[in-house]
Design a protein with these regions (language model features):
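Conserved SAM-binding loop of SAM-dependent methyltransferases across substrates and taxa
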Residues: 58-70
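Conserved SAM/SAH-binding loop
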Residues: 102-109
């Protein structure tokens, strides 16, 4: 199946889902604010061979990145019915370069060889930057990237994340600005320059309640 046909079919499964996966029920809106938003600022070399999508929800951005760039994705979310639905739909569409797991990011460190395992991590609409860095950095290789999709309010979050970056072994690499139907969007790119201390991520809920300051 051609890329664009796969994208079309997958968007249709999202907007017609019996469970609330995305905030769109109109194809054109979903196409722009889910697919284009996921892929426009991204480059194949950002992802490497294998990426993790933390808090994937309806498979965004992970499914679209796997289709567009061919990288292998590991998609996790704490809501099992969402992961199960996305997994089943991807199997129906024969999107084969994806794995799925229903789990909290804080618990992944105890499940298999995932610490500093992935070439990159992506996350969209999960939480503030300091929190998401704690949930992603432990699973990215030194030299890998963490790519976070944000709106115009990212600057304040970034300012509050300086200590988290130092503590987790990541640094800001660049900010890519792009526009979707007149709305400014930003891809915040971090590079992992050092190993993340073993104590991270902390226990479930702590990164959200008490971000590293």
């Amino acid at each position: 199946m051609e890329k664009q046909e796969l994208v079309k079919r997958y968007i249709e499964t999202l907007i017609s889902s019996p469970i609330n996966l995305v905030g769109y029920d109109n194809f054109e809106e979903a196409y722009h604010f889910l697919y284009i938003d996921s892929t426009l600022p991204m480059k194949a070399e950002d992802l490497g061979q294998k990426f993790i999508d933390v808090g994937t929800g309806g498979g965004v951005p992970g499914v679209f990145l796997a289709i567009e760039f061919g990288a292998s994705g590991f998609l996790i979310d704490s809501v099992c019915k969402k992961i199960e639905y996305v997994k089943n739909k991807c199997e129906e569409l024969k999107i084969e370069n994806l794995e799925f797991l229903c789990i909290r990011a804080e618990e992944l460190k105890d499940k298999g060889p995932y610490r500093e395992y992935f070439d990159s991590a992506v996350s969209r609409a999960v939480s503030k930057i300091a929190t998401v860095l704690e949930l992603t950095a432990p699973y990215v290789k030194v030299g890998g990237k963490i790519l976070l999709y944000k709106g115009p309010g990212y600057t304040e979050e970034l300012g509050q994340s300086v200590n988290a970056m130092k503590e987790l072994g990541v640094k800001l690499s660049e900010v890519r600005k792009y526009t979707i139907k007149g709305k400014d969007r930003f891809l915040i790119v971090f590079e992992k320059f050092d190993k993340t201390p073993e104590k991270y991520p902390r226990k479930v809920g702590i990164p959200e309640k008490r971000p590293i300051r």
